[in-house]
Amino acid sequence: MDHIQLLNDKIDINLIHQLLIDQSCGACSVFLGTTRDNFEGKNVISLEYEAYENMALKEMGKICTDLRVRWPSLKHIVIYHRLGIVPVSEVSVVIAASAPHRVAALESVNFAIDQLKSRVPIWKKEVYEKDLIGEWKANVECPWPQYSKTSLRTFEFFSCKIDQKTENIPDKLVQIRVDDSELNRRVKCFLKRKRDEINLYNIHDFKQLSTNTELADSSESEVKYSCARTQSSLVKQQQSKSHLKVRREIDNSGPHVRPNYSSQLNKLTTAQHYKNDSFENSMLRNSRLRNIEEYMCVTSDGDNILNRIKNIENKILLLESISPEYKYFVSIFIIVYQMFILSNS
């Protein structure tokens, strides 16, 4: 028989023993999880447990089912977990099993402990002697990456040393002209917006789907108490290796929405091709263009000067659409472009 329960009071060990005893069983394995008084040099005074009780009980029942599939000889299974404040040295969780032989009892309890930590929605907070607010702790058995405080810190510039120092940078080469506080505000707003978008998409992408008639005919309570942590269903999208939907985005902002953008772009990107071997073979002019390509991170397109200039133009248009501040840099490029056209004519 399976005995699962969430308690707000102390767990009675004698009751657990009575639930396990059976005349056909020769082994009882019991695990008791207690509150220790220290963690990484801090004095712990208590643990506080919270749970999504409906889902927790369902997952505990599924664990019992998995145990009986793996070890059919199990007679009784007990999973008790205490909620609320648990002082030091008191029992917070009990996992026990009885079987005719000790191997099944010992192995099943060990397996159940790991499954309880990784699957059941129960959260633990450690309350310290000098920090009564406490700190929520994640189980190492959880499949997702562990939370790290360093992930929320600002970028540490000292970790990336720059040997070359540039002084007296012209203002026209600076794309974003704001102070550090404004820049940090923009970054935080961007991260917050992306986090909200991800949370919104997760609501649609990670949800319980009715895969059979039993789920379809189930009561509303079954759908109400669904949890993405344990009942997520990913549906692979067509022509994609992921569950994410691929959408075509329409950009309604940028230089391409300006009046006469196409004609202006054609003027910049089209030019008459003059066959001039002396120009193509000129090391001086070629080196000047190569320097611009290296600065703009553009791949050189052979010896065709016009195609190389067109690639640089496309890169500048891309940067201008990404960052509005980059439009101040366009005037410099136009001057360089006109110099090459005049030298080619």
Swiss-Prot record:
Annotated substrate binding sites: 101-102, 117, 124-126
Gene3D superfamilies: Molybdopterin biosynthesis MoaE subunit
Reactions it catalyzes: 2 [molybdopterin-synthase sulfur-carrier protein]-C-terminal-Gly-aminoethanethioate + cyclic pyranopterin phosphate + H2O = molybdopterin + 2 [molybdopterin-synthase sulfur-carrier protein]-C-terminal Gly-Gly + 2 H(+)
Pfam families tied to this protein: MoaE
EC assignment: 2.8.1.12
Function as written in the Swiss-Prot or TrEMBL entry: Catalytic subunit of the molybdopterin synthase complex, a complex that catalyzes the conversion of precursor Z into molybdopterin. Acts by mediating the incorporation of 2 sulfur atoms from thiocarboxylated Mocs2A into precursor Z to generate a dithiolene group.
Protein name: Molybdopterin synthase catalytic subunit
Molecular function GO labels: molybdopterin synthase activity
Cellular localisation: Cytoplasm
Quaternary data: Heterotetramer; composed of 2 small (Mocs2A) and 2 large (Mocs2B) subunits.
UniProt xrefs under HAMAP family: MOC2B (MF_03052)
SUPFAM superfamilies xref list: Molybdopterin synthase subunit MoaE (SSF54690)
InterPro entries: MoaE_sf (IPR036563), MOCS2B_euk (IPR028888), Mopterin_biosynth_MoaE (IPR003448)
Main subcellular location: cytoplasm
Note: This protein is produced by a bicistronic gene which also produces the small subunit (Mocs2A).
Keywords for the protein's UniProt record, in alphabetical order: Cytoplasm, Molybdenum cofactor biosynthesis, Transferase
Pathway listed: Cofactor biosynthesis; molybdopterin biosynthesis
One GO biological process term: Mo-molybdopterin cofactor biosynthetic process
Similarity remark: Belongs to the MoaE family. MOCS2B subfamily.
GO cellular component: ATAC complex; cytosol; molybdopterin synthase complex; polytene chromosome
